[in-house]
Amino acid sequence: MPKFYCDYCDTYLTHDSPSVRKTHCSGRKHKENVKDYYQKWMEEQAQSLIDKTTAAFQQGKIPPTPFAAPPAGSAMIPPPPSMGGPPRPGMMPAPPMAGPPMMPMMGPPPPGMMPVGHGPGMRPPMGAHMPMMPGPPMMRPPTRPMMLQSRPGMARPDR
């Protein structure tokens, strides 16, 4: 009867039967060997990718990133104001970001402003979606931690 060879463990099993293979493959040493094998394989793949990227960059096939360090002796172009960073001369610093963004105010628009998408007093057509507001998505306002509810008749220790 042919023997079964385990590539991960570099060993032959006593014989090739499903029960022997199952027992071997569920063993601690086999699992460690499989984990080590794939960990080494991933490291080799990552190093190969790094080497290929470095070679392509050195050959000029990959352009430098726009905000990378400038070559020696050249002037650096400052990033746009939306990227943050220190204020430039003559500019006011940006206000600090404190707390979550404010929730939009609901109600009629200020006088002279038209509502987004529809005329005054008009509702969107049936099945139509409301238009998206520009800007970042709004966050839920912070809430108190949820209190555990007790069953009727049980004393509440927090009161």
From Swiss-Prot:
Keyword Nucleus (UniProt): yes
Alphabetized InterPro entries for the sequence: Matrin/U1-C_Znf_C2H2, Matrin/U1-like-C_Znf_C2H2, U1-CZ_Znf_C2H2, U1_snRNP-C, Znf_C2H2_sf
Keywords on record: Metal-binding, Nucleus, Ribonucleoprotein, RNA-binding, Zinc, Zinc-finger
One Gene Ontology cellular component annotation held by this UniProt entry: U1 snRNP
Domain of life of the source: Eukaryota
Sequence segments annotated as region (Disordered): 63-95, 139-159
Keyword Secreted: no
Residues in Matrin-type zinc fingers: 4-36
PANTHER family xrefs: U1 SMALL NUCLEAR RIBONUCLEOPROTEIN C
Sequence similarity: Belongs to the U1 small nuclear ribonucleoprotein C family.
Protein function: Component of the spliceosomal U1 snRNP, which is essential for recognition of the pre-mRNA 5' splice-site and the subsequent assembly of the spliceosome. snrpc/U1-C is directly involved in initial 5' splice-site recognition for both constitutive and regulated alternative splicing. The interaction with the 5' splice-site seems to precede base-pairing between the pre-mRNA and the U1 snRNA. Stimulates commitment or early (E) complex formation by stabilizing the base pairing of the 5' end of the U1 snRNA and the 5' splice-site region.
Protein name in the entry: U1 small nuclear ribonucleoprotein C
Gene (name only): snrpc
